[in-house]
């Protein structure tokens, strides 16, 4: 039996990051977590590109353009959608998740989902670096692992 696994060796890896500006008090913490992890795992600063978009809904388009450019081994998508009193939350969450997943499938580039979808600001804060860890950091680790997994499968 042959088992494929990705590791956290970040040699010659280029990463694109798409960050939503809406709820920036949360998304900036997600970005800081991602950047800290990438640097800790020895991804060079010149091998990281960050694109800011207005809101979570715009993330899939820029993630798709980055993935199709073939300049990045993985894309990390960061945003925060917090439930309000209208159905807008449901539409945004559904479309963003579909768009991100479709980008990965269409391009073969790992596209990591670091978009928080929470019922409250408190839940978002917890997932951006307090009680529940930092989703940006988790996505950075996942990006490195997925790049190496794909490389190990390219026989």
UniProtKB/Swiss-Prot annotation:
Write down the SUPFAM superfamilies for this protein, in alphabetical order: Lumazine synthase
Q: What is its EC number?
A: 2.5.1.78
Q: Which Gene3D superfamilies match?
A: Lumazine/riboflavin synthase
What are this entry's molecular-function GO terms?
Answer: 6,7-dimethyl-8-ribityllumazine synthase activity
Q: Which UniProt keywords apply?
A: Riboflavin biosynthesis, Transferase
Q: Where does 5-amino-6-(D-ribitylamino)uracil bind?
A: 22, 56-58, 80-82, 113
Active site positions, chain numbering: 88 (proton donor)
Q: Where is the signal peptide?
A: none
Organism superkingdom: Bacteria
Q: Provide the function of this protein.
A: Catalyzes the formation of 6,7-dimethyl-8-ribityllumazine by condensation of 5-amino-6-(D-ribitylamino)uracil with 3,4-dihydroxy-2-butanone 4-phosphate. This is the penultimate step in the biosynthesis of riboflavin.
- Pathway this chain belongs to: Cofactor biosynthesis; riboflavin biosynthesis; riboflavin from 2-hydroxy-3-oxobutyl phosphate and 5-amino-6-(D-ribitylamino)uracil: step 1/2
Reactions it catalyzes: (2S)-2-hydroxy-3-oxobutyl phosphate + 5-amino-6-(D-ribitylamino)uracil = 6,7-dimethyl-8-(1-D-ribityl)lumazine + phosphate + 2 H2O + H(+)
BP-aspect Gene Ontology terms: riboflavin biosynthetic process
The molecule here is called 6,7-dimethyl-8-ribityllumazine synthase
**Pfam families annotated for this entry?**
DMRL_synthase
User: Keyword Zinc-finger: yes or no?
Assistant: no
Q: Which NCBIfam families match?
A: lumazine-synth (TIGR00114), PRK00061.1-4 (NF000812)
A GO CC term attached to the entry: cytosol
